[in-house]
């Protein structure tokens, strides 16, 4: 079990399916767990950078995930382009592990605004 309070996943509004009967299996923009081999996750401090790099023009939903309820392996892997290690989930996200699914608003300049959606950086 991970010693962090939450993991995060950015989903496009069109990919987020509120059907709570199936585990969530979208890895990243338009790619499934089956295609990618894992689901891209982030720590709170990584979310805004991922959003800026990949989701700038998308309607986005922030999934907050309880790592204690994730049954598949989570592995932190270096992403040299980002200069950081990101959590990758090698299985689906159980719906019961998703604590919240919150649409991310846009600020006046059009960027995604995570104010109040993420804990303050440590």
Tell me what each language-model feature is:
Residues 1-122:
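Conserved, structured core segments of small domains
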């Amino acid at each position: 079990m991970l010693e962090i309070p939450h993991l995060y996943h950015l989903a496009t509004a069109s990919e987020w399916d509120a059907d709570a009967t199936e585990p969530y299996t979208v890895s990243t923009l338009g790619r499934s767990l089956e295609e990618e081999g894992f689901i891209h996750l982030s720590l709170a401090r990584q979310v805004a950078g991922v959003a800026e790099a990949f989701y700038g023009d998308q309607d986005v939903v922030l999934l907050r995930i309880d790592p204690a309820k994730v049954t598949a392996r989570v592995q932190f892997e270096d992403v040299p382009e980002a200069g950081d290690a990101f959590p990758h989930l090698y299985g689906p996200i159980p719906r019961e592990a998703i604590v919240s699914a919150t649409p991310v608003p846009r600020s006046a300049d059009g960027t995604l605004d995570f104010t109040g959606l993420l804990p303050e950086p440590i």
